[in-house]
Swiss-Prot record:
GO molecular function: alanine-tRNA ligase activity; aminoacyl-tRNA deacylase activity; ATP binding; tRNA binding; zinc ion binding
Cofactor annotation comment: Binds 1 zinc ion per subunit.
The protein, known as: Alanine--tRNA ligase
Keywords recorded for this protein, A-Z: Aminoacyl-tRNA synthetase, ATP-binding, Cytoplasm, Ligase, Metal-binding, Nucleotide-binding, Protein biosynthesis, RNA-binding, tRNA-binding, Zinc
HAMAP family assigned to the protein according to its UniProt record, in alphabetical order: Ala_tRNA_synth_B (MF_00036_B)
Pfam families found in the cross-reference section: DHHA1, tRNA-synt_2c, tRNA_SAD
UniProt keyword Thylakoid present: no
Length: 881
C-alpha cells in the first residue's frame, strides 16, 4: 500500500466521493471545550453540532484531525517510545453524519473502504457491538457477511460512548484486525484481550440517545461519529505491526540516526522513537500558538520537548538536535498541514532556544543531585520527594536521576516519587480552567438558539436603530432593566463592535422613547451574539424596545488608528526580524496598542528604529486601506496572513494596506474582523514606546498613534527643553552633556571610594591601632562608616596585601544604622582560620544571623551597626581562643 500521505488522502477522497464535506483539521487548542487541554479526537470540533447549538451547511463530514494526548486524563507521554502504538501526537481519520445516515450506511461505508478500496482480507476482520445492540449485530451479518463467531457482544462501557453525564450518547461498534495466531493475545472480551494479536482499527459510534438526569431518550435525528488512527491503519496497510515502521516515522528516525550516528534498531531504539514522536507534537503545538512555559498547555509542551531532548543526549548529541529535525517533518507533513510550513522558522527557533536552556538545566540538576546525595552510600535509597523536586522544580528527568545514582548503587524511592506526582496531577486537574465559554455564559446559548446571530453594521456606520431582543442580569434573562440598573442587552442589529481579536469593545449611548442607557462595553458571545454592557440612566429598558444606537465616535476613531497601526507594525517586524515573527496576542485600545509576537531575544535600538520607520513610511504615503470579503481558503492562498489558532468562518474579511515598493503587492494583508481607518494617513503617526519580554520566546511591543502619540512626543519635547535649560546647553547638546555628567559622577564616586579606602588603611579609623598580634597572628581591624558595601572586599584585599600574613576584618556602619562585616584570611593561614566562621561570630554581635562566602573571604551583616567595634573585638577574642 502507499505511504501515510496517500492513505490519508484516499480516506478523505473516498468519503468525499460518497457525499461528505472535507473539513480541515481544527487546531490542537480546542475552540469550544473549556474542559479539554488539547484536541484529542476528531469529534471535538463538531461537539456543538452534535448537541444542536451550532449549525453547519453540511450534514456529512470527513476529517483528518491532528490530536495530542499528553496531559490530564488522556496522557500517553510515559509510554511513548517503549510500545509499538503509543503516541503523543497522532492523526484521527473520521467520517460524521449529523442526522443524515445512521447504522446501516455507516457500516456499509466502513466495510467497503477497508475491504474493497484497501483490500484487507475479510477473514481477518471481526466486529464488536454493544451487548443489546441487535440492530448493529444483524447489520454486520447482512452487510459484511460476518459469521456469528466474528461478531462479539461487549457488555462494558468500552462499547458505549457518552459525551458526559448528560447529552448525546450511544453504542459503539469496533472493527478489529487479526494479525494471526503467531502473535499472543485473545479476541476482544476475552481474558487475554490486551495482547497484540487483535488490534482495533476503527470505532463507529452510533449517537442515538440523549442522556438526561434520570432518563435516556431517543434522539430525533441520530448521528454518526467514527474514529480511525492514521498511524495504526498505515502500519497495517504497509505490512507492519509497528506504527514506528511506517514510511513517515521511518523518515524522521532515519534523520535522527544520520545526525547522531547511532543505529535506530539497536539498544537505543526507544530514544529514536521518542524523538520522532515528540518532534511532531512540538512542531504542531507551536504552529497552533502554544509556546513552552511553566503552566497550562505550555508546561505540557515543555515536558514533551525536554523528554525528547533528554533522549537526544542519551544518543550522545553534544549540541542541540531537535531544531535540526524540523525540515524533515515539514517535508513529510507540510502538504497536508500547511500551518507547519508557515511556522517552520518559529518552531526551529523555539526548539533551539528550549534545548539550549535545557542543557543548562541538566548541568544545574546534576550539581544539585550530587549535593542532595552526598551522604548516601551504596545500597541506600534516594528520597522520592527530593527526586520529584528535582523533576518538578528544575525540570530534571527522573530517568536521569536514576541513571546518575545507579552507578553508585543508590536506588530512588519510586513509590514516594509516584505519590508526589499523583498529588501534582490531582492539583493540576483541579486547577485546570481551560479556555472557551465559562459555565456562567450558558445563558447565551439559549439566547443564540432563540434569537440567532446579531447583525453587525459597524463597518459602515456608527449610528443605527435596533430593537431589544434579550436582557440579562446576573447570568439570567430578565424582562426589564429599570433606571440605575446595570445589565446586558442583545439587539437584533448593532453598530457597536464586540470585543474580539484583541480589539476592545465599543462604548456609546442608546436611547428610545422615555429611556436612555450608557453602553459601557460590548462583547461577543458564541462568536456572533453581540452583548452590550449597559447602565440605564433614564426610564426602563424592556424587551422589544426600539432604540437609537450611537457609538462613541472619538473613541472608535482612536481604536481604528491603533488597529491599523498594529497591522503595519506586525509586517514591519517580519521585514526587520524575519518570517518567524508571528502574532501571539494583542490589545487594541483607544489610548494605546500592545502587540505580542514570537521572537527569542530583545530588539536592539536599531531594530526598534527600523520597525518604527517602516510603519511611518506607510502612514505618510496615505494609501487606501482596502477590505474584501473572500472564501477563507482563497484568502490564505492569496497570501493573507491568518493567525495560528484563530477561528475563521467560511467567508472572511481581508484587510490590506500599503503598497510594497519592491513588487507592487500590498505591504500588509491579514484576515481581520476589526475596524480600520480608511487611509493609512488617518493613523497620524506611530511612536514605539517599548519592547519587553512577556514569556520565553515572546516579546511585547507597545506603541501610540494619532493624538496619544502627539501628546507623548510633545511631553518628551517639553522635558528635553526643560533639561536643556537646566544644563544651559542646546537641545542637540543634551545627550553629550548628560553623558559627561554621568561620567563625572562615576569618577567622583571612584575618588570617594579610594579616599575612604586610604583613610581606612591609614590608621585603622576609629578603632585605634591598625595591626595587632593575637597569639602570633597579625590582625588588622578596621571600623568605618558610610562606605559603599561594594568597596568593603577591596579594603579587605588591600589589608591582606599590607599585612602579608594574618586576618583582616572590616566593619561598616551605614547611614540607616545597619552594620556590615567582611573578614579575610591570607592564603598561608587557610588551614588554621575560616573566614566564614569568624564572620558569623561578628555578625551575631551586630544582631544578625549567619554569613556566607569562602574560607578565605566571607561577609555578613546585622541591624545594629553601633556595635561595629564590639564585633571586631569578638573576632579578636576568637583568634586568641
Amino acid at each position: 500500500m502507499s505511504g501515510v500521505n496517500e492513505i490519508r488522502s484516499s480516506f478523505i477522497d473516498y468519503f468525499v466521493k460518497n457525499g461528505h464535506e472535507a473539513v480541515a483539521s481544527s487546531p490542537l487548542v480546542p475552540r469550544n471545550d473549556p474542559t479539554l487541554m488539547f484536541t484529542n479526537a476528531g469529534m471535538v470540533q463538531f461537539k456543538n453540532v452534535f448537541t444542536g447549538v451550532e449549525k453547519r451547511p453540511y450534514s456529512r463530514a470527513v476529517t483528518a484531525q491532528k490530536c495530542v494526548r499528553a496531559g490530564g486524563k488522556h496522557n500517553d507521554l510515559d509510554n511513548v517510545g517503549y510500545t509499538a502504538r503509543h503516541h503523543t501526537f497522532f492523526e484521527m481519520l473520521g467520517n460524521f453524519s449529523f442526522g443524515d445516515y445512521f447504522k446501516d450506511r455507516a457500516i456499509e461505508l466502513a466495510w467497503n473502504l477497508i475491504t474493497k478500496e484497501w483490500d484487507l482480507p475479510k477473514d481477518r476482520l471481526l466486529a464488536t457491538v454493544y451487548y443489546d445492540d441487535d440492530v448493529a449485530y444483524d447489520l454486520w451479518k447482512k452487510v459484511a457477511g460476518l459469521p456469528d463467531s466474528r461478531i462479539i457482544r461487549i457488555p462494558t462501557s468500552d462499547n458505549f460512548w457518552a459525551m458526559g453525564d448528560t447529552g448525546p450518547c450511544g453504542p459503539c461498534s469496533e472493527i478489529f484486525f487479526d494479525h494471526g495466531d503467531h502473535i499472543p493475545g485473545g479476541p476482544p472480551g476475552s481474558p487475554d484481550e490486551d495482547g497484540d494479536r487483535f488490534i482495533e482499527i476503527w470505532n463507529l459510534v452510533f449517537m442515538q440517545y440523549e442522556q438526561l438526569p434520570g432518563e435516556r431518550l431517543n434522539l430525533p435525528r441520530p448521528s454518526i461519529d467514527t474514529g480511525m488512527g492514521l498511524e495504526r491503519i498505515s502500519a497495517l496497510l504497509q505490512g507492519t505491526h509497528d506504527n514506528y515502521e511506517t514510511d513517515l516515522m521511518r523518515a524522521i528516525i532515519a534523520e535522527v540516526q544520520e545526525l547522531t550516528n547511532v543505529p535506530s534498531n539497536g539498544p537505543q531504539k526507544a530514544s529514536h522513537r521518542v524523538i520522532a514522536d515528540h518532534l511532531r507534537s512540538s512542531v504542531f503545538l507551536v504552529a497552533d500558538g502554544v509556546l513552552p512555559s511553566n503552566e497550562g498547555r505550555g508546561y505540557v509542551l515543555r515536558r514533551i520537548m525536554r523528554r525528547a531532548m533528554r533522549h537526544a543526549q542519551l544518543l550522545g548529541a553534544r549540541e542541540p538536535l531537535m531544531h535540526r529535525l524540523v525540515p524533515v517533518l515539514v517535508r513529510e507533513m507540510g502538504r497536508a498541514y500547511p500551518e507547519i510550513v508557515r511556522a517552520e522558522a518559529l518552531a526551529t527557533e523555539t526548539l533551539l532556544l528550549e534545548e539550549t536552556r535545557f542543557r543548562r538545566t541538566l548541568e544545574r540538576g546534576l550539581s544539585l543531585l550530587e549535593e542532595e546525595s552526598a551522604g548516601l552510600v551504596s545500597g541506600a535509597r534516594f528520597p522520592g520527594e527530593v527526586a520529584f523536586k528535582l523533576y518538578d522544580t528544575y525540570g530534571f528527568p527522573l530517568d536521569l536521576t536514576e541513571d546518575a545514582l545507579r552507578g553508585r548503587g543508590i536506588e530512588v524511592e519510586r513509590e514516594a516519587f509516584d505519590a508526589a506526582m499523583e498529588r501534582q496531577k490531582a492539583e493540576a486537574r483541579a486547577n485546570w480552567s481551560g479556555s472557551g465559554e465559562a459555565a456562567t455564559d450558558t445563558v447565551w446559548f439559549g439566547v443564540r438558539e432563540r434569537e440567532g446571530a446579531t447583525e453587525f453594521l459597524g463597518y459602515d456606520t456608527e449610528t443605527a436603530e435596533g430593537a431589544v431582543r434579550a436582557l440579562v442580569q446576573e447570568g439570567k434573562e430578565v424582562s426589564e432593566l429599570p433606571a440605575g440598573a446595570r445589565g446586558f442587552v442583545v439587539l437584533n442589529q448593532t453598530p457597536f463592535y464586540g470585543e474580539s481579536g484583541g480589539q476592545v469593545g465599543d462604548s456609546g449611548l442608546v436611547s428610545g422613547e422615555g429611556v436612555k442607557a450608557c453602553v459601557l462595553n460590548t462583547q461577543k458571545k458564541l462568536g456572533d451574539v453581540f452583548v452590550h454592557d449597559v447602565e440605564v440612566t433614564e426610564g426602563t429598558l424592556k424587551i422589544g424596545t426600539p432604540l437609537a444606537l450611537e457609538v462613541d465616535h472619538a473613541r472608535r476613531s482612536a481604536v481604528r488608528a491603533n488597529h491599523s497601526a498594529t497591522h503595519l507594525l506586525h509586517e514591519a517586524l517580519r521585514r526587520v526580524l524575519g518570517d518567524h515573527v508571528a502574532q501571539k496576542g494583542s490589545l487594541v485600545a483607544p489610548d494605546r496598542l500592545r502587540f505580542d509576537f514570537s521572537h527569542p531575544k530583545p530588539l536592539t535600538a536599531d531594530e526598534l528604529a527600523q520597525v518604527e520607520d517602516i510603519a511611518n513610511t506607510y502612514v505618510l504615503r496615505n494609501e487606501p486601506v482596502e477590505t474584501r470579503l473572500m472564501a477563507v481558503d482563497d484568502a490564505v492562498a492569496s497570501g493573507a496572513r491568518a493567525l495560528f489558532g484563530e477561528k475563521y468562518g467560511d467567508e472572511v474579511r481581508v484587510v490590506s494596506m500599503g503598497t510594497d515598493s519592491g513588487n507592487g503587492a500590498p505591504f500588509s494583508v491579514e484576515l481581520c474582523g476589526g475596524t480600520h481607518v480608511k487611509r493609512t494617513g488617518d493613523i497620524g503617526i506611530v511612536t514605539v514606546l517599548a519592547d519587553s519580554g512577556v514569556a520565553a520566546g515572546v516579546r511585547r511591543l507597545e506603541a501610540l498613534t494619532a493624538t496619544a502619540a502627539r501628546r507623548h512626543l510633545n511631553a518628551a519635547s517639553t522635558a528635553l527643553q526643560t533639561t536643556a535649560g537646566t544644563l544651559k546647553v542646546s537641545t542637540a547638546e543634551v545627550e553629550a552633556r548628560v553623558a559627561a555628567l554621568v561620567e563625572e559622577r562615576r569618577k567622583l564616586e571612584r575618588d570617594l571610594a579610594e579616599a575612604r579606602k586610604k583613610l581606612a588603611m591609614g590608621g585603622g579609623g576609629e578603632s585605634g591601632p591598625a595591626v595587632i598580634e593575637v597569639n602570633g597572628t597579625r590582625y588588622l581591624r578596621i571600623a568605618i562608616s558610610g562606605a559603599d558595601p561594594k568597596d568593603l572586599k577591596a579594603i579587605v584585599d588591600e589589608g591582606k596585601t599590607k599585612i602579608g600574613s594574618g586576618v583582616v576584618a572590616v566593619a561598616n556602619t551605614a547611614a540607616d544604622g545597619k552594620g556590615a562585616l567582611v573578614v579575610g584570611v591570607t592564603a598561608d593561614l587557610a588551614g588554621k582560620f575560616d573566614a566564614q566562621k569568624l564572620v558569623r561570630i561578628g555578625v551575631e554581635v551586630l544582631g544578625g544571623k549567619g554569613g556566607g562566602g569562602r574560607p578565605d573571604m566571607a561577609q555578613g551583616g546585622g541591624p545594629d551597626g553601633a556595635k561595629a567595634d564590639a564585633a571586631l573585638a569578638a573576632i579578636e577574642s576568637a583568634l586568641g581562643a
